[in-house]
Amino acid sequence: MSQERLLSVLRAPHISEKATNNAEKSNTVVLKVALDANKAEIAAAVAQLFEVKVDSVRTVVVKGKTKRRGNKMGRRSDWKKAYVTLAKAKIWTSWTVQSNRRKLENGYR
């Protein structure tokens, strides 16, 4: 896999209560990934970038919500979420903390 593709597969960690519980209990990390990425690419990207052994990868395509402003209808984009189970107990707490800090600095909630 090329270096460009490797970096474009993983987008961001998905921070939620369910993701945090999965990380603590079943050693699973939840990531936002490219919509066209497959399980093999996701596993290879995580293994190479973070130097961990990947046990399994499960993916879900989250459908975008329909939104309305006045009489105008719009739709948010679909996105893909990957549940990556790691072989050993190694969770990226620093990555999730840095991501949250970056979002707060940029004004996101």
Curated annotation (Swiss-Prot):
Keywords per UniProt: Ribonucleoprotein, Ribosomal protein, RNA-binding, rRNA-binding
GO molecular function: rRNA binding; structural constituent of ribosome
Record carries keyword rRNA-binding: yes
GO biological process, one term: translation
A GO cellular component annotation in the UniProt record: ribosome
Origin superkingdom: Bacteria
Keyword Aminoacyl-tRNA synthetase attributed: no
Pfam families: Ribosomal_L23
Subunit structure: Part of the 50S ribosomal subunit. Contacts protein L29, and trigger factor when it is bound to the ribosome.
Function description: One of the early assembly proteins it binds 23S rRNA. One of the proteins that surrounds the polypeptide exit tunnel on the outside of the ribosome. Forms the main docking site for trigger factor binding to the ribosome.
HAMAP family reported for this sequence: Ribosomal_uL23_B (MF_01369_B)
Protein name: Large ribosomal subunit protein uL23
Source species: Haemophilus influenzae (strain PittEE)
